[in-house]
Amino acid sequence: MRFVAFVKTATGAAIDAADALARAGRIGPGTLGPVDARAVEAAIRLREAFGGEVVAAAIAPPDVMGAVREAIAIGADRGVLLADPQIDTADLIERGRVAAALLTHLGADIGVFGPWPGDVDGTILWSAAGAVLGWPVLPQARSL
């Protein structure tokens, strides 16, 4: 099975902590956010249970590549970055369509998302991707 975990850089308080660590020389730019790290870890647990591959995917500007690399460092098998300036200005429904297209392109069986900035608890983007693919959406799962 192929599990795709979507990642992005840390935001809000996580950025403040990441900036402090970067100034101390402990991490570089594009730090993986804690929620997305949990999404990658969930995908890794699924891979351990069912076999297959974990792909860390980002739909973001190139500076997010650091987050993709961190996802690989914690156990993702490979990473993919889809960077296009037109996507940066897209609304959440369009981003959901892009996520669905990327999931299809990668041959994903399951997509794992963390909350998306500007999204109401992440449900708009996830639901849009699920609707395009005809997949069920399980928002805010507490365990797998």
Roles of regions detected by a PLM:
Residues 1-144:
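N-terminal glycine-rich FAD/FM-binding segment characteristic of electron-transfer flavoproteins
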